């Protein structure tokens, strides 16, 4: 294990303020919620940082550490006497607190990750996007040349009576692919969702892949757009598409009425519809039959005659169809 000064990246002559600034920077850097993809290593570093700060921030403990090292505090080696170590019974050893307790004591009830924006320069305005107990955190890495890697994380803390909830979302762009990891810690349970280019790829609960949770989440996401599509499709189907068919039917009815009218006119004039051999003879003898329409009083000649200039009426067309 490296020395406490190396862990906090400060010289041995660092002042108390230097120790505090170093702990703030390192604790936020290695907080497990900030490193969901490298949890075990982050937890180890987070614990070392808390231990180093707990010793170097205390003047008496720092003196013991400078003289005897870490063994002088744990009692595993040649260390100070009971009087030097402070009050305690025989065999006194220093007991380190949990890193989470040190973290909460240092930052209090405020937003711990908001502290980073003091040193982010032009990005400090992004702090306003978070609420009192939440705030975004951004990190940038090399993007030159041909390699694009950007990650962002947002944290939400809900401290309460023994309850702690943390939501972390990180997005990384690597070689044109977008990898998004969402990690939720609540009531001692960890849920991690991993997306690639917007497609959910995996869901793990407490480090164990959960296919059932993955299927339920995929189904929930697919239901939302399908409901919208179905509601929109109903309106499209209401567009009337039968108008051309209705128009054709109306034209057929008009033609039938015209034909019936012509037949009645011919019967009233004492003529019979052409048919049988007489009709065949007339069709073979001349291209077009000549007939007189008593209703209109006009004549029509065949192809050899001289055609009239006016256009035939619907009744005349119907009569011509019957004759032919």
Curated annotation (Swiss-Prot):
SMART domains: DnaJ, UIM. Residues 224-241 have a biased composition (Polar residues). A lipid is attached at residue 321 (S-geranylgeranyl cysteine). Residues 280-289 have a biased composition (Basic residues). It holds the Pfam family DnaJ. CDD domains: DnaJ. One of its GO terms (cellular component) is perinuclear region of cytoplasm. Changing residue 265 to A: Loss of interaction with polyubiquitin chains, loss of interaction with PSMA3, and loss of the ability to protect ATXN3 from proteasomal degradation. The modification Phosphoserine is found at residue 311. One of its GO terms (biological process) is negative regulation of cell population proliferation. InterPro entries: DnaJ_domain, DnaJ_domain_CS, DNJB2/6-like, J_dom_sf, UIM_dom. A motif (CAAX motif) lies at residues 321-324. The modification N-acetylalanine is found at residue 2. Functions as a co-chaperone, regulating the substrate binding and activating the ATPase activity of chaperones of the HSP70/heat shock protein 70 family. In parallel, also contributes to the ubiquitin-dependent proteasomal degradation of misfolded proteins. Thereby, may regulate the aggregation and promote the functional recovery of misfolded proteins like HTT, MC4R, PRKN, RHO and SOD1 and be crucial for many biological processes. Isoform 1 which is localized to the endoplasmic reticulum membranes may specifically function in ER-associated protein degradation of misfolded proteins. Interacts with HSP70 (HSPA1A or HSPA1B). Interacts with HSPA8/Hsc70. Interacts with PSMA3 and most probably with the whole proteasomal complex. PANTHER family: DNAJ HOMOLOG SUBFAMILY B MEMBER 2 (PTHR45168:SF1). This is DnaJ homolog subfamily B member 2. It comes from Homo sapiens (Human). The lineage of its organism: Eukaryota, Metazoa, Chordata, Craniata, Vertebrata.
């Amino acid at each position: 294990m490296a020395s406490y000064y190396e862990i906090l990246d400060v010289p041995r002559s660092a002042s108390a303020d230097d120790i505090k600034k170093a702990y703030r920077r390192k604790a936020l850097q290695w907080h497990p919620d900030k490193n969901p993809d490298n949890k075990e290593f982050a937890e180890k570093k987070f614990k070392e940082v808390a231990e180093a700060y707990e010793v170097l921030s205390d003047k008496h403990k720092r003196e013991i550490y400078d003289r005897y090292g870490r063994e002088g505090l744990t009692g595993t080696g040649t260390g100070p006497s009971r009087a030097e170590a402070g009050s305690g019974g025989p065999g006194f050893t220093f007991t380190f607190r949990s890193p989470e307790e040190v973290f909460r004591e240092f930052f209090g009830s405020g937003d711990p990750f908001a502290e980073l924006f003091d040193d982010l320069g032009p990005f400090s305005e992004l702090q306003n996007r978070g609420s009192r107990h939440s705030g975004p955190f951004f990190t940038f890495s090399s993007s030159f040349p041909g390699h694009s890697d950007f990650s962002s994380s947002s944290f939400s803390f809900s401290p309460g009576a023994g309850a702690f909830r943390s939501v972390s979302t990180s997005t990384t762009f690597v070689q044109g692919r977008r990898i998004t990891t969402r990690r939720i810690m609540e009531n001692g349970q960890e849920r991690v969702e991993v997306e690639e280019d917007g497609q959910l790829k995996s869901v793990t609960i407490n480090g164990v892949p959960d296919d059932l949770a993955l299927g339920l989440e995929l189904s929930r996401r697919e239901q939302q757009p399908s409901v919208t599509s179905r509601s929109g499709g109903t309106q499209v189907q209401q567009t009337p598409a039968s108008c051309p068919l209705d128009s054709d039917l109306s034209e057929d009815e008009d033609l039938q009425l015209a034909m019936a009218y012509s037949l009645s006119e011919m019967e009233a004039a004492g003529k019979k519809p052409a048919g049988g051999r007489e009709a065949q003879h007339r069709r073979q003898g001349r291209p077009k039959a000549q007939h007189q329409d008593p209703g209109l009083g006009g004549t029509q000649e065949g192809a050899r005659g001289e055609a009239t200039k006016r256009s035939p009426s619907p009744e005349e067309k119907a009569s011509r169809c019957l004759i032919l």
